[in-house]
């Protein structure tokens, strides 16, 4: 595996592969890799000739009171994991290379990005869309891989790619979980032992949402309220966002029965926010399958 630090070097190295018609897969990350990231790598390697992983903690997607400086970083550890996973190229640019001067161009998908997590983190998804767009321009990949844990992000990136006619296939990969069901996340390292034990309320809340859906609850407001109440049974957990949405458009639902439903959770434990979600398939669809 080769570690590349600059945009120009990466473009030069990938040019021969592109001329030879090789498929390039791309996994953008902010580092401090876990099993979920490695699953994205495995998918890319299985489907492409060359795999590029980027590690870049993007300052544009952090708010003024968020954890940019504290975000976990360990490039040596991450590089060792990627080497063992047979990644071809690790792109680890400095902020000064990605943003040599203050950005005046911003890519925003406001209808999708200003709701749900975007309500709690104003400007976050504009920062995400801007850096992902720039990385797509740099790498020129045929396919890019994103975890479904960050479902809103995945929907936003797909829409950006469609709107901007970017020639890349966006692949969503199923959420990888710990043995107790908690979604793998770089931010899990922030949790104290007590908070880590309490965090299991998040996947359990998704189970409860599915149980209520299967029982015939049709009013989205009632279902959201029930999920909030369920999460609040854990004293250390605060539900910041509980949303039932259309999984393709993120539109609010007036009724949940008779259609697939995205249940999206944004739960705070101490200073740590955990994201999780589940798309609950319509019963009739499952029976017909």
Swiss-Prot record:
GO terms for cellular component: cytosol. It catalyses: (R)-pantoate + beta-alanine + ATP = (R)-pantothenate + AMP + diphosphate + H(+). This is Pantothenate synthetase. Homodimer. PANTHER family: CYTIDYLATE KINASE/PANTOATE-BETA-ALANINE LIGASE, PANTOATE--BETA-ALANINE LIGASE. Belongs to the pantothenate synthetase family. Beta-alanine binds at residue 61. Pathway: Cofactor biosynthesis; (R)-pantothenate biosynthesis; (R)-pantothenate from (R)-pantoate and beta-alanine: step 1/1. Keywords: ATP-binding, Cytoplasm, Ligase, Nucleotide-binding, Pantothenate biosynthesis. The active site is at 37 (proton donor). The reaction proceeds by a bi uni uni bi ping pong mechanism. ATP binds at residues 30-37, 147-150, 176, 184-187. InterPro entries: Cyt_trans-like, Pantoate_ligase, Pantoate_ligase_C, Rossmann-like_a/b/a_fold. (R)-pantoate binds at residues 61, 153. It comes from the Bacteria. NCBIfam families: cyt_tran_rel, panC. Gene3D superfamilies: HUPs, Pantoate-beta-alanine ligase, C-terminal domain. Its main location: cytoplasm. Its EC number is 6.3.2.1. It is found in: Cytoplasm.
């Amino acid at each position: 595996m080769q570690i590349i630090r600059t945009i120009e070097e990466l473009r030069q190295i990938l040019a021969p592969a592109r001329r030879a018609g090789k498929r390039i897969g791309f996994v953008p990350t902010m580092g401090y890799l876990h099993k979920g990231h490695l699953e994205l790598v495995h998918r890319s390697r299985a489907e492409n000739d060359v795999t590029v992983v980027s590690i870049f903690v993007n300052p544009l997607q952090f708010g003024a009171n968020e954890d940019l400086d504290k975000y976990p970083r360990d490039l040596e550890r991450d590089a060792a994991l990627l080497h063992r996973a047979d990644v071809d190229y690790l792109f680890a640019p400095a902020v000064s290379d990605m943003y040599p001067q203050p950005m005046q161009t911003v890519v925003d998908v406001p209808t999708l990005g200003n709701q749900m997590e975007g309500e709690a983190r104003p400007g976050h998804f504009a920062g995400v869309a801007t850096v992902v767009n720039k990385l797509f321009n740099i790498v020129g990949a045929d396919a890019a891989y994103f975890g479904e844990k960050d479902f809103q992000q995945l929907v936003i990136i797909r829409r950006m790619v469609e709107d901007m006619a970017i020639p890349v296939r966006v692949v969503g990969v199923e959420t990888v979980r710990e043995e107790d069901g908690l979604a793998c996340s770089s931010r899990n390292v922030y949790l104290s032992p007590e908070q880590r034990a309490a965090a299991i309320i998040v996947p359990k809340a998704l189970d409860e949402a599915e149980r209520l859906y299967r029982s015939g609850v049709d009013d989205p407001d009632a279902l959201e309220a029930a999920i909030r109440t369920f999460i609040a049974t854990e004293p250390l957990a605060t539900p910041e966002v509980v949303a039932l949405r259309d999984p393709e458009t993120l539109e609010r639902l007036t009724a949940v029965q008779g259609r697939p439903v995205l249940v999206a959770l944004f739960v705070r434990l101490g200073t740590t926010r955990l994201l999780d979600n589940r798309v609950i398939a319509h019963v009739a669809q499952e029976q017909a399958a």
